Design a protein with these regions (language model features):
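ATP-dependent carboxylate-amine ligase
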Residues: 1-141
Length: 141
């Protein structure tokens, strides 16, 4: 999906931008997140797929972009975003959590979100982040 907004029962707003991902599209989506109103701004970032040998460098670059985005919390999901997570930790960013796949993250994200949160979901379509959004919409109390 491309920039679809969904309001949860608990008052959190999700930004579903899970159709595709590149460094530039992640930057654009983060700019949108930063400009909008929200008590807490949270980014949930999945792998950018099909990068081959460039993957580690690009996912570290994503870490740099996230570090400079003044976010309240970051969640990374996938095998390649471990490089994003490592970059953030090495630069003393502590408000983050990494999951190897989306199935591990459902309950954690569901429990994390609160009224007023603005949450960006961004990653390659093959990362299935849209499944998390569907779960949250269906299971939010």
């Amino acid at each position: 999906n491309r920039l679809e907004f969904k309001k949860l029962k608990n008052g959190a707003t999700l930004i579903d931008d899970t159709y595709n991902a590149s460094l530039d599209s992640i930057k654009s989506s983060l700019e949108l997140l930063i400009k909008r109103e929200g008590k807490r701004k949270i980014a949930i970032i999945g792998d950018v797929l099909e990068l081959g040998t460039f993957s580690k460098n690009l996912h570290e670059e994503i870490g740099k972009v996230l570090l400079n985005s003044d976010l309240d919390y970051i969640i990374t999901i996938g095998n390649e975003t471990k490089y994003t997570d490592e970059y953030l930790k090495n630069n003393n960013y502590d408000n983050l959590k990494h999951f190897n796949n989306e199935n591990e993250s459902y309950e954690y994200i569901n429990n994390l979100l609160k009224d007023g949160d603005l949450v960006l979901f961004k990653g390659s379509h093959g990362m299935h982040l849209s499944n998390i959004i569907k779960y949250l919409v269906d299971n939010q109390k």
